[in-house]
Amino acid sequence: MAPRPAAAAVFVVGAVVALLLLPPPAAAAPVGVNWGTMMSHPIHPSAVVEMLRANGVDRVKLFDADPWTVAALAGSGVQAMLAAPNDQVASLARDPHRARDWVRHNVTANVNAGVDVRYVAVGNEPFLKSYNGSFINITFPALKNMQRALDEAGFGQRIKVVVPLNADIYSSPENKPVPSAGSFRKDINTLMVDIVNYLHANDAPFVVNIYPFLSLYHNPSFPLNFSFFDGATKPVYDQGMVYTNVFDANFDTLVWSLRKAGVPDMRIIVGEVGWPTDGDKNANIKYAQRFYNGFLRKMAKNIGTSLRPGRMEVYLFALIDENQKSVLPGRFERHWGLFTYDGKPKFSMDLSGNGKGNLAEVKGVQYLPSHWCVFNKDTKDKYKDLPASVNYACSNADCTPLGMSGLVLLEALQRSQQQMLHKEGACFQYMF
């Protein structure tokens, strides 16, 4: 489990807000959110829950079952998807007792405390090609052990086990890039058929993460406007269906894949969907706002897709920027949040999809006094070790927002000092 932040952390709220004192929640939004906590200065969970309620968000998807975070959901009316992270999948697959212990500590205890747990996720995107098959032989056994543990604890009918999967597990051939040609990846097709039939037999949904931004990021020739929902693109036609955006086309490719796997009516949840605001030429406020405005309008209308009309269950990715995430997938990884690291909305947005109102920010965030790093004019050869100084600073701070245009030493050191809580010496040898 992730350790709790130190008491000196910048964004710890001074007083925990009792849930009984929270204002009544706003009208429920048509979407949930992913709440990640990989940040150097986490906002107090109780303050985040208050913000969720103020914005009408009644569902969250977590990436673990951290007690400090989950406890804040007790009595809040916010439904939760808890998760056993990828580093726990092997032990869950190997030992059924581990699954029972996991359920006892993370499900039974939290449900008894008033947390509305709806799903338990086993791993996260375990079949990504970048994992080189590390989870192929252990995910299904872990899934079955977790399901048995929930059944034994009496939760099997109300809490469903799922495996959130990336959209790279299915595709259409290059010579026929339409949804009806879609199927599961050849290397995992048999496994996926087994998994989806097992999930379906237990009345559990298929959870898929769909990212139009990544279609654009990985393919420079991808038509930009096909990433959005305003119809400003050439449509794709497929067996009488018309697709004007990649989200719908991707979703229906999954529908076809499930049909071919023998579960045509399987329920689908979109576990992650969103647009980053920094770290790439196409990751910016303008495009993020365009994406969300179109997507939320679509969700509010409950129109679904060509093959699955009606209401969809979706979780936006993500709630708050996480400055401790790995940037191996890209510099944008730390900038998916609807809110900045200190809980402020990045842009005007209405989760109801009606185009009215703005996001409510996190209340009660406290800040340390402002300090600044400046050059010491008496330092000799102050430019000699400039690259080393930048590397030093960026080893402590998130420098990805400036990655597209080059990084200024003072800015890097300033970020480093903030992350190190203004410790003496954090400005390094070129500062005073």
Regions found by a protein language model. Name each.
Residues 31-35, 58-62, 78-84, 118-122, ...:
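Hydrophobic faces of well-ordered beta-strands that scaffold small-molecule active sites
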Residues 46-68, 79:
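Catalytic domains of carbohydrate-active enzymes, especially glycoside hydrolases
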Residues 28-43, 92-94, 181-185, 374-383:
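Active-site mouth loops of central-metabolism enzymes
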Residues 1-32, 357, 362-368:
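Terminal membrane/secretory targeting segments in land-plant proteins
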Residues 71-170, 175-185, 270:
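Substrate-binding cleft of extracellular glycoside hydrolase catalytic domains
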Residues 51-52, 72-73, 110, 199, ...:
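Generic structural signal for hydrophobic
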Residues 36-52, 96-110, 189-193, 385-389:
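Short, acidic/polar
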Residues 49, 140, 144-148, 155-163, ...:
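Substrate-binding and catalytic surfaces of secreted/luminal carbohydrate-active proteins
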